[in-house]
Each structure stands twice: as structure tokens, then as C-alpha cells.
């Protein structure tokens, strides 16, 4: 058999797509205080950053993946809301307006593993997000 067609699959996205957001609020939260949609109590005192983006944008509601803020990986806490989700920044104090990387070509597999899915689902989940295309 001889074919003249190639299916590129993930090669079309890998390394070419990043999802960047920003911190919309950050605060110290005490153990037992409620964070996220439906109210998930925190197990420890910690710093929490609230990131713009929620299930309306393609963030998994029940188990949002974490994000990178200030070079630190921050695990998600609570259930994502329609427009915001929370991450535990631990000792790092995030600033309002600070850049947040949800994933990029290097970290999409981590996001997929946290959501117990494949990279393709992470790349294609985003809906109303503003796209920025750069010529390379």
C-alpha cells in the first residue's frame, strides 16, 4: 500500500500554543476557610491566587489543572467557577495583574495528566478565549 497523506495530530499544536491569563486577586487564606465554587475548605493556611478563566473558557470545572505563577507551579484548589479558579501559591505571594501560564508547549502534558486526559483535550478545550497569533 502507498499513501500520500499524513495525519499530523498533536504536532499541529505542540509547542505552538500557550494559554496565558492573569491573577485577579490574591490573599492569605486560613485552614478551613472556603475556596471555589460550592465551597471547598482548605486543609492548611496558605496563600491563594485567583486566576481569570473558568469553565466557560475551557478550564475543567471539577478538577482544574494548576498553573505557573512567578516561575512556581501552583496546584488548583477548590472547584473552578465560570470565570475564575483558585491556585495554592504556598509561600509565594502573587500580585494582581501578574502573568499566569496555564500551559504551554512544554507543560501541556502535566496539565493533561492532572486532568486524567490526553494533551489533545487540553489544547482543544478553550472556547471564548482571546487568541493572539504571532508570525514566526
Task: List each language-model region with its residue ranges.
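Active-site anion/phosphate-binding pocket segments in diverse small-molecule metabolic enzymes
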Residues: 1-136
Amino acid at each position: 500500500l502507498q499513501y500520500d497523506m499524513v495525519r499530523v495530530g498533536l504536532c499541529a499544536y505542540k509547542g505552538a500554543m500557550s494559554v496565558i491569563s492573569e491573577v485577579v486577586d490574591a490573599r492569605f487564606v486560613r485552614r478551613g476557610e472556603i475556596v471555589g465554587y460550592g465551597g471547598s475548605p482548605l486543609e492548611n493556611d496558605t496563600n491563594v491566587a485567583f486566576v481569570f478563566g473558568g469553565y466557560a473558557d475551557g478550564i475543567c470545572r471539577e478538577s482544574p489543572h494548576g498553573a505557573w505563577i512567578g516561575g512556581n507551579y501552583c496546584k488548583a484548589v477548590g472547584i473552578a467557577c465560570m470565570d475564575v479558579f483558585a491556585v495554592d501559591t504556598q509561600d509565594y505571594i502573587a500580585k494582581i495583574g501578574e502573568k499566569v501560564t496555564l500551559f504551554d508547549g512544554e507543560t501541556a502534558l502535566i496539565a493533561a495528566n492532572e486532568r486524567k486526559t490526553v494533551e489533545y483535550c487540553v489544547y482543544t478545550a478553550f472556547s471564548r478565549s482571546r487568541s493572539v497569533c504571532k508570525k514566526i
